[in-house]
Regions:
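Short extracytoplasmic
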Residues: 68-95
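C-terminal regions of proteins
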Residues: 297-380
C-alpha cells in the first residue's frame, strides 16, 4: 500500500469505495431506465390495444368479429351513436332497456340502435340526440336519422335544463384526443373490455343491449314487487295544479323541441311508459295528482303541435298496470310489455292525436279513482 493512499472507516482504500459507489449508482440508473422503458412500453401497448379494439367506439366502428361487451351507457353510448350504422334510435330512461330492436325492424322495417340512459333527465336525452345528429359522424354520413323513439318520464321534467342524472366522462363526449388519457391508459378498460372479451368470447347482442336479462320469473309478480315497495309519506298540502308548468316548459323547449324543429327529416315518437298502479298510489299520497295530470297534458299536447311528432300513452292499459305479474318493481315492466309497445308503434294502437291527451288522462284518472288500493296492499 502506497504511503499516500487513504483508508476509509471500514478499512478499505477510499478509492475502492468511491469506485464501488459509482458502479452501484450506475446499476441503479440502468435499472431505473429499464423500469421506465418497460413501463412506457406497457403503457404504449395498453394505448395501442385500446385504440385498435376501441371498446367504447370512440375512434371507429366495431371491428368485425370482435366480441364487444356493451354494458356502460355513459361511456359507450356516445361512440355507438357516432360510429355504428343505424337509421333510428331508441332512448330515454330504464323504461327503454328491455326493448328488442328486432321488434322495431319487424313492426316498422327500421334499423334501430338502443341508446338507453338510466334515470335520464331531459338533458341526458338531449346529449344522446347531439351524438346521433353529429353530421361529421360515420353514422350520419351513412344515412339520415329517420326515427327517434323516446320515453317520457314526466317526473324528471322538473330537473334543471342543464342537469344530468350522473357525472359524465367528458373525455368521451368531445372529439379532442388531448384529453383521452383516462380512456387509453385505463386498467379497467383494458382488462374488462379488451382482454376479457378475447378470453370469454361472449359478445353483447346489440338487439337487446342493456336489457335486464338476469331478471327471471322469480323477479316478477305481486309478492316480489310488494316486498320492495315503500309507499311515499302522506303530504297534507296539495301541490298547485301549475306547480310543474314552468320547469317543464323550459325542458321541453331546450332539450326536446329544439331537436324536433331542427330535424324535420326525423319522425319523433314519444311515449309515456306504463308504470304500475302503485306509481299512482304514490302520486296520490304525495298529493300532486292534479299537478301531475296537468304536466302530462302539457307535455303531450305541446309535442303534438309539431308535424313530425307522434305520441303514445300506455299508462291507461288497465289490465296491464293493475297486474303486478308484469312488473319487477312498481315502475319497471317485463320485456313482453316492451315488445307490445314496439308493435303498437307500427299499428298505431294507443296513439294520441292532437287534443286527445285530456281523454286518455280522464281514463287514467278513472282507473286510479276506482282502484281499491287498501285491499290490493293488504297482507295476504
Amino acid at each position: 500500500m502506497g504511503k499516500d493512499q487513504t483508508i476509509d472507516k471500514s478499512g478499505h482504500p477510499a478509492e475502492d469505495t468511491r469506485s464501488n459507489h459509482a458502479a452501484s449508482s450506475a446499476q441503479v440508473r440502468r435499472a431505473a431506465a429499464v423500469f421506465a422503458g418497460t413501463a412506457a412500453a406497457l403503457l404504449i401497448l395498453c394505448a395501442v390495444l385500446t385504440v385498435i379494439v376501441d371498446p367504447f367506439f370512440h375512434y371507429h366502428a366495431p371491428l368485425k368479429g370482435f366480441p364487444y361487451v356493451v354494458d356502460n351507457q355513459l361511456s359507450q353510448n356516445p361512440g355507438m351513436a357516432r360510429n355504428m350504422t343505424y337509421d333510428s334510435i331508441i332512448t330515454g330512461s330504464s323504461m327503454t332497456v328491455n326493448f328488442n330492436t328486432n321488434d322495431f325492424r319487424e313492426a316498422m322495417g327500421v334499423n334501430a340502435l338502443k341508446l338507453s340512459s338510466n334515470g335520464a333527465y331531459p338533458k341526458d336525452i338531449a346529449n344522446v340526440l347531439d351524438f346521433a345528429y353529429d353530421e361529421h359522424s360515420k353514422a350520419r354520413k351513412a344515412s339520415p336519422l329517420t326515427n327517434a323513439f323516446i320515453a317520457i318520464d314526466v317526473a324528471v321534467f322538473t330537473a334543471g335544463p342543464e342537469e344530468v342524472k350522473y357525472p359524465q366522462p367528458t373525455y368521451l363526449y368531445d372529439k379532442s384526443p388531448l384529453n383521452d388519457i383516462p380512456y387509453l391508459l385505463n386498467k379497467d378498460v383494458l382488462l374488462q373490455y379488451v382482454l376479457r372479451p378475447i378470453v370469454e368470447r361472449e359478445a353483447t347482442d346489440l338487439a337487446t343491449v342493456y336489457a335486464t336479462t338476469w331478471q327471471t320469473e322469480e323477479y316478477f309478480g305481486k309478492d316480489w314487487v310488494l316486498q320492495g315497495f315503500v309507499p311515499s309519506e302522506v303530504r297534507e298540502k296539495e301541490e298547485p295544479k301549475d306547480a310543474y308548468r314552468e320547469k317543464t316548459e323550459i325542458n321541453l323547449e331546450r332539450n326536446i323541441l329544439s331537436y324536433v324543429r331542427q330535424h324535420p327529416e326525423t319522425e319523433f315518437t314519444f311515449f309515456f311508459p306504463p308504470y304500475s298502479i302503485l306509481y299512482w298510489y304514490n302520486v296520490e299520497r304525495e298529493n300532486h295528482l292534479e299537478a301531475t295530470m296537468a304536466q302530462y297534458e302539457q307535455i303531450g299536447e305541446t309535442l303534438l303541435k309539431e308535424d313530425n311528432v307522434r305520441v303514445f300513452y300506455f299508462q291507461d292499459m288497465e289490465d296491464v298496470v293493475t297486474d303486478l305479474a308484469n312488473y319487477s318493481d312498481y315502475e319497471h315492466y317485463s320485456p313482453a310489455i316492451n315488445s307490445y309497445m314496439a308493435a303498437c308503434f307500427g299499428t298505431g294502437e294507443h296513439e294520441v292525436h292532437p287534443g286527445g291527451m285530456h281523454e286518455v288522462l280522464d281514463h287514467m284518472r278513472s282507473i286510479v279513482d276506482s282502484f281499491d288500493f287498501e285491499t290490493f296492499l293488504a297482507p295476504q
